[in-house]
């Protein structure tokens, strides 16, 4: 199977934006979220990674807009941002998305997370946002503001609970065009049988080709954001590169 590419549409107040290292206020705006998502579909995307940054930072929600985006797309949507309890999970799934990403709640409310993994199976992925500090792999929550414990301990717990998929971000790379952390991706993939999706740092077609070399180890896909918006390459070029 070729590497699956998921163009990212990060939403703030209804607009598509990109942040640098997830920092609120660091965004560059790229227009309407609906237009951005439809544009990636038109360019050949099979999946869209749709993120409600207002919900992730706890400052509101773009729920109605997200539902509109999902409704207008013919492709699969992975929805992320602020999914922390039964109400927000139900609202996210009600948009018609194919799956949701749970992040902070997997760290702060492990019992709830274990239950929804059990109830929803393949519809729930867990986002692992990793910061490497003095050689230690620490997880970050609440829009990357809080410490969420040791990556390998949390991964072992979630894996034992049957988590169906992990979305792995090296947050020092996200939005920087600094290249992906291949060692981190391989390390996670080697410790779980669940598929892994890479996020953060992709800057070139060679970066995507490098991630694609990890598919046999369990890396299933890559989320691509800033590189596409900054026109480092087009989505058709990226799709062709990982199919070579």
From Swiss-Prot:
Gene Ontology biological process terms from the UniProt entry: L-histidine biosynthetic process; L-tryptophan biosynthetic process
Xref: Pfam families: His_biosynth
GO-annotated molecular function: 1-(5-phosphoribosyl)-5-[(5-phosphoribosylamino)methylideneamino]imidazole-4-carboxamide isomerase activity; phosphoribosylanthranilate isomerase activity
Major localization listed first in the record, in broad terms: cytoplasm
Active site per database record: 10, 129
Domain of life: Bacteria
Protein EC: 5.3.1.16, 5.3.1.24
Location of the protein in the cell: Cytoplasm
Pathways per UniProt: Amino-acid biosynthesis; L-histidine biosynthesis; L-histidine from 5-phospho-alpha-D-ribose 1-diphosphate: step 4/9; Amino-acid biosynthesis; L-tryptophan biosynthesis; L-tryptophan from chorismate: step 3/5
Catalyzed chemical reaction(s): 1-(5-phospho-beta-D-ribosyl)-5-[(5-phospho-beta-D-ribosylamino)methylideneamino]imidazole-4-carboxamide = 5-[(5-phospho-1-deoxy-D-ribulos-1-ylimino)methylamino]-1-(5-phospho-beta-D-ribosyl)imidazole-4-carboxamide; N-(5-phospho-beta-D-ribosyl)anthranilate = 1-(2-carboxyphenylamino)-1-deoxy-D-ribulose 5-phosphate
Nuclease found in the keyword field: no
Keywords noted in UniProt: Amino-acid biosynthesis, Aromatic amino acid biosynthesis, Cytoplasm, Histidine biosynthesis, Isomerase, Tryptophan biosynthesis
InterPro entries: Aldolase_TIM, His_biosynth, HisA/PriA_Actinobacteria, Isoase_HisA-like, Isoase_HisA-like_bact, RibuloseP-bd_barrel
Gene Ontology CC annotations of this record: cytoplasm
NCBIfam families: hisA-trpF (TIGR01919)
Family under the similarity heading: Belongs to the HisA/HisF family.
Purpose: Involved in both the histidine and tryptophan biosynthetic pathways.
The protein's name: Phosphoribosyl isomerase A
Species name: Mycobacterium tuberculosis (strain ATCC 25618 / H37Rv)
Taxonomic path: Bacteria, Bacillati, Actinomycetota, Actinomycetes, Mycobacteriales
